[in-house]
Amino acid sequence: MSILDQIEVPKRGAQIITICGDAGTGKSSLAATFPKPVFIQAEKGVERIPAEIRPAALPQVVGSHKDADGNFINNTFWDQFKALIREEHDYKTLVIDSISALDRLFVSDILLQDGKANNLNSAMGGYGAGFSTLATKHQQLRKAAEMIRQKRGMNVVFIAHAEVDRVSPPDQDDYSRYSLRMTHSKSLPPYL
């Protein structure tokens, strides 16, 4: 058998994508049209999707907190994510709405875990280590998305809000630069 006899068209697999846009532009509504979606909500938004395409959604994720004994109670995001990997269901698309809101929850978690810091720059020992910890959380999320894609064959859609900067170079026309609205640029690569 020759090498060329082994050529075949690859089967289409599940996708991992990021939808980015301004508020109210229909990012969640677009994601709701994907095959059999279920939303993990880091912010409210599913209720604004037209009723005829409104998807199933898990309860809105809340931030971490400490119990009466001072034990760190993690937010439900990872619990919801793990349930979609481990438990039987017929959903075909996981939508995370939104990574911009989830980023804020991650920041709150880091500051709560540190206990002393009041900003990311001084968190986790200072010298910007909080930003690296934040970036690691986003990398873990991207790896978890790959895991659910491989193990469950699910599409994963990350919804992100856009941050628009006006750029005025001296030798060119002004233009707008769009990027994902995140706390720090180190958190962007997993979603691009």
Predicted features by range, described:
Residues 151-192:
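Phosphate-binding/switch region of NTP-binding enzymes
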Residues 69-153:
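Phosphate-binding/switch loop-helix module in NTP-utilizing enzymes
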Residues 56, 110-114, 174-176:
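Glycine-rich, phosphate-binding/catalytic loops in enzymes
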Residues 2-96, 100-107:
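Conserved P-loop
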Residues 6, 145, 185-187:
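Catalytic micro-motifs at enzyme active sites that drive phosphoryl/nucleotidyl and oxygen chemistry
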Residues 1-3, 17-21, 118-119, 153, ...:
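A broad, low-specificity signal for short, low-complexity segments enriched in glycine/proline
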Residues 28-31, 147, 188-191:
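Hydrophobic/aromatic ligand-binding patch that stacks against planar heteroaromatic rings
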Residues 44, 62-67, 118-122, 182-186:
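Glycine-rich loops and low-complexity Gly/Arg-rich segments
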